[in-house]
Amino acid sequence: MSEKVVLAYSGGLDTSAAVKWLQEKYGMDVIAVTIDVGNEKDFTLIKEKALKVGAKKAYVRDVRKEFAEDYIWKAIKANSMYEGVYPLATALARPLIAKVMVDIAMEEGATAIAHGCTGKGNDQVRFDVGINTLAPHLKIIAPARQWGMTREQTMEYAQKWGIPVPISVKNPFSIDENLWGRSIECGLLEDPWNEPIPEVFAWTRPVEATPDAPEYLEVEFEQGVPVAVNGEKLSPLALIQKVHDIAGLHGVGRIDHVENRLVGIKSREIYEAPAAVVLIAAHQALEAMTLSKSQLRFKQMVEATYSDIIYNGLWFSALRQDLDAFIESSQRFVSGTVRLKLSKGSFRVVGRKSPYSLYHKGMATYDKGDQFDPSSAVGFITLWGLQAKLQAQLQPILEEEKGNKS
């Protein structure tokens, strides 16, 4: 009896070709697994295609709710933005996909897991590290990393075996999408000087096609988790979709970024993430009101590390769990509502309120009702500047700090 390999199957070029290649190269029975993390795809057709191209069995697993509650919500609490720009949509989904693949491999008694990642991308690291962490006994096969074919040659290989492919040499964009965002690469986008053509975008309107009137959006949070939009309590999936639709209508969420990949190269990436950029910005605004200065400063360091952990494929690491403990604690009082104004491809926070706000109007105002005692400032300034004053008296100041008198 042939050994079984569980293949992460998207229905695209690489994984469709991989079904036949795995059978040819290893003589294995291929079990295709397609994971729904919010992809806008016809999963019935993908399952049928997997069987048609030679898979012995095909699974479709809907994990959207788990993705939102156990991954996206954590990313919001951590304000996760790789290099301050990318909200990590693809990177966030990979550990969940790896987990489901391992679960099915165990159920099926498979000896290997295969994926369609190339040798240049980050996803190969995310899948391999995740699988090795969860099930080190399983063999990992990456056909696109091993077969040595160019994209055009892969198309020819697929056509040779009668495998339909959804792309052409003239329009060779590689697209990945889920609840949290959409990434587009390859083709003309590989030249960072080229402006993305309109066909690259699917979720966000071009500025010239957005409404002339701005739109206000209110997002309510409970302990760091978004729970309502414009006063309406929504499920996680419905809430993300609601913000996605409103932000996309106004052209919000386009990202054009030259990114430092984990494998050591720079890559030009185009992203659409309307819900992600709006919800993270709203969350940051609420934190600015409810966390102390020292909490915010320390959390910013944690956020950078947390984002790197996600990007670098270390979701299942002990460090991520440790940082989660701090982040969860920091969200105890991050409850309230943030109002945003969206218009013509941009947005900004225009209001925020919280029962746990550390903003005290009586202390901040310069008008009637001022409760701040200005006489307290004198003693504070004396003590605050004492060390700098003493050091200047006891140690010579560098000449360049004094200014060149000659």
Curated annotation (Swiss-Prot):
Binding site for L-aspartate: T118, N122, D123
Protein name stated in the entry: Argininosuccinate synthase
EC number: 6.3.4.5
Compartment annotation: Cytoplasm
Principal location class: cytoplasm
Quaternary structure and interacting proteins, as annotated: Homotetramer.
Binding site for L-citrulline: Y86, N122, R126, S174, S183, E259, Y271
Family: Belongs to the argininosuccinate synthase family. Type 1 subfamily.
Catalytic activity as recorded in UniProt: L-citrulline + L-aspartate + ATP = 2-(N(omega)-L-arginino)succinate + AMP + diphosphate + H(+)
NCBIfam families: argG, PRK00509.1
GO molecular function: argininosuccinate synthase activity; ATP binding
One Pfam family per UniProt: Arginosuc_syn_C
Encoding gene per record: argG
UniProt keyword terms in alphabetical order: Amino-acid biosynthesis, Arginine biosynthesis, ATP-binding, Cytoplasm, Ligase, Nucleotide-binding
Domain of life: Bacteria
Species in which this protein is naturally found: Dehalococcoides mccartyi (strain ATCC BAA-2266 / KCTC 15142 / 195) (Dehalococcoides ethenogenes (strain 195))
Enzyme class: ligase
GO cellular component, one term: cytoplasm
